[in-house]
Amino acid sequence: VNKFIIIDTESQTEGIFERDKKNKYKVITYSFVTTGKDNGLFSYETPKGMFLVAATRPFMAFGKKIIEEEKEKIEISGTAKGAIRFSGGGYMHGIPTSLKDEGNGRKVTESKIGTFKESHKCVRHFDDQISFILKWVNSDSKTMVRDYTIPEDPVVVIVI
């Protein structure tokens, strides 16, 4: 494995490293992120450990449960740029935007990146950062399953 993403939940930062042909690790990028906070209901702490990136996609859709005619269903309520799956239900993605947001919700969320734990499990990034990471993870990958890209080079995510 030559590609690593290390996420520090205490400092709300992330470092991306790649081993070169001389077996030296180089810092590719270092940035602020927002990780998950457990609220006991529907929000969870970002899982700690080592994970292999399973797949990526160009966007992340968010849903909310609604009850219609006594039946529970999921309705798409927002999206975010990029989606990198690193654990069961845990993703790295851009700033989430509600489909009904007519105010400054996106700017408020963006202003909190790197400050404190706030997401529902995922790792939030600035949009330009997640775009860069998505290209770096996928590099020349051509394996597609629906709208998911399967990285050809393994990428390990370490959450501490």
Where are these regions (language model features)?
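Gly/Pro-biased beta-strand-loop elements
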Residues: V1-G103
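Exported/periplasmic cell-wall-interacting domains
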Residues: M60-I160
